[in-house]
Amino acid sequence: DKSGVMFTVDPVSKDAGRLVIEAVFGLGEGIVSGLITPHHYVIGRSDGAVLDEFVPVQLLAIMCDSESGGTQEVALDEVQGNSRVLSDGELGELRVMGLRLEACFGKPQDVEWCIRGGELSLLQSRPITTR
């Protein structure tokens, strides 16, 4: 399982030709809390090409804890921790979702998403509010 955020316009450079995706293994709480450095992908809007990628080692994930009903920190093994969070196919699916959301709402979007069991789900979409 994996989750993250996507911006349909580069929130730093404001480049509309680039989508920015950040991803972690497990729940997105790891990104929001700053506990886990996410994988960072910049992809081309028109063709989905990976333009830039930062893939730090992730040795920890935030996962659901079915016993407590909360979350727990789980250590990742070396193989998974050194693996890329998102495949090229998943990046492509996210790109398509982001562009559809932007077309639907008429503004660049800040999107929260997750992938569980190979299925991409939209959690939230809102206009980008960075200045």
Model-derived features: where do they sit?
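Conserved mixed alpha/beta core segments that line enzyme active sites in large multi-domain catalysts
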Residues: D1-R131
